[in-house]
A protein has these predicted regions:
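Mid-to-C-terminal alpha-helical segments outside catalytic/metal-binding sites
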Residues: 2-6, 19-73, 77-96, 100-101, ...
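Divalent metal-dependent hydrolysis catalytic cores, especially in the metallo-beta-lactamase
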Residues: 7, 71-82, 95-116, 146-153, ...
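Short, solvent-exposed turn/loop segments enriched in Gly/Ser/Thr/Pro and often Arg
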Residues: 10, 40-42, 105-110, 150-155, ...
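Active-site metal-binding loops of divalent metal-dependent hydrolases
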Residues: 12-13, 333-334
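Active-site loop-helix segments enriched in His/Asp/Glu that coordinate
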Residues: 95-98, 109-137, 157-166, 185-188, ...
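Hydrophobic membrane-embedded alpha-helices
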Residues: 108, 115, 120, 272, ...
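Short glycine/proline- and charge-enriched loop/turn segments
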Residues: 117-119, 223-234, 344-349
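Catalytic pocket-lining loop regions of alpha/beta-barrel enzymes
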Residues: 125, 144-147, 152, 156-158, ...
């Protein structure tokens, strides 16, 4: 009997220098791709078209001190820091932390900041290169333990559909969204093609903590007469992913696609009971003015279609009378600054005190396996020696 899943982190981050995926960017576009430079302080900075200098900081903490800037992917001797190395190093870091697998999200430098690149062909080539490298050179070492999300471009529906299909061909189980499939911060009817294809392909949707833009509240200097209904029902519930959920609900996405599910990671989940309460209260308070009638309360839609990712969220595990704990997934957020590395097992023990074993298993293994189509009882890849 081999190694089994005991703890899966539903929230890890690929924080590596860009050299690996840059090789997959077509040569004609490579000079427009992001660059990592060494600063006089010894820290790293990112040069991305259309952005100011971007500093490594909270994204590469590992078990070092928290830094908001002046951090590096490299130790003083030039070796990779914790969380910034190759996939074998990452597997050893899982072992050190006492976990068996991670769901991996793209670094913010690739996921969001490259959206400022003006030439969309260049932008698309970078997204494609990152996904190719991730599948071919990183996750392939142990695809049952390094379970990454392919990144979906924000350059329009056609590009989103193409990369979704390519992600399936590359072997990904899940994709990460930054905007709605149409490429904007708001849903459009054409997005239905993407939702339908994701279900057809069996591709999970894991957009980190939100996607899309803020709900429209009009001129910030004006009164509430310009508010959208999404803005009204998220009043007093401003944290992610309330705006995304409100847009999906109000635009009928869940009614048209009752099988659609989303996993939102790293949510700091103790606020979720309040978010659900205010969304329901506001819906009943404001629906007549807006002339909106939903088939269900907002909280019902959310709980039927959403998994919530928790990190260091002990309070939410004491709120089972307010929100179903069966909808949660634990994550370490490694190597980011709010993470639990390398003491995840102790923190889990402390957080889950008094939680029955069946529920603990769902939060640590079962829910994320069901979302990704993994067998929770399968033998998994052992860590290579080097």
């Amino acid at each position: 009997m081999g190694r089994k899943y005991q703890i899966i982190s539903g929230d890890g981050h690929v924080e590596t220098p860009p050299d690996g995926w840059l090789q997959y960017v077509p040569e004609r576009y490579r000079d427009r791709a992001p660059r990592l430079i060494r600063l006089p302080s010894g820290a790293d900075g990112w040069l991305v078209e259309g952005q100011p200098m971007l500093h490594n900081g909270q994204n590469i903490k590992g078990r070092g001190p928290v830094k908001f800037a002046n951090a590096s992917y490299f130790n003083a001797d030039g070796s990779p820091r914790e969380g910034a190395g190759d996939p074998i190093q990452r597997l050893h870091e899982q072992d050190l932390d006492g976990i068996d697998a991670e769901v991996l999200f793209a670094p913010v430098f690739v996921a969001r900041f490259i959206e400022s690149i003006s030439d969309k062909a260049v932008y698309r080539s970078i997204v494609s290169a990152y996904n190719t490298w991730l599948a071919a050179d990183y996750c392939s070492v142990a695809p049952d333990r390094l379970i990454a999300n392919a990144l979906i471009p924000v350059s329009g529906l056609a590009d989103a559909l193409a990369e979704l299909s390519r992600a399936k061909e590359l072997g990904f189980r899940s994709v990460q969204l930054q905007q709605f499939p149409n490429g904007s911060g708001a849903p459009k009817p054409e997005d239905d093609q993407f939702w339908a294809l994701s279900l057809e392909l069996g591709m999970a949707l894991s957009p980190h903590f939100s996607f899309g833009g803020a709900v429209w509240r009009g001129d910030p200097r004006a009164d509430t007469s310009q508010w959208s209904f999404e803005a009204a029902i998220t009043q007093h519930a401003p944290m992610s992913p309330a705006a995304t959920l409100a847009q999906l609900i109000v635009h009928g996405v869940y009614d048209r696609f009752p099988e659609l599910k989303f996993y939102f990671a790293e949510l700091n989940c103790a606020y979720i009971p309040g978010m659900l309460y205010y969304m329901d209260r506001n819906y009943h308070e404001f629906k007549d003015w807006f002339g909106v009638s939903l088939k269900k309360d907002p909280s019902e839609y959310v709980l039927e279609h959403t998994l919530f990712g928790m990190v260091r969220d002990a309070p939410v595990l004491r709120m089972g009378h307010l929100v179903p704990l069966e909808r949660f997934v634990w994550g370490s957020d490694f190597p980011h600054s709010v993470g639990t590395f390398p003491t995840s097992t102790q923190q889990i023990k402390d957080m889950f005190e008094g939680i029955d074993e069946a529920l603990r298993r769902k939060i640590l293994v079962g829910n994320i396996c069901a979302h990704l189509g993994l067998d929770p009882d399968a033998d998994i890849t052992d860590t290579p020696a080097s």
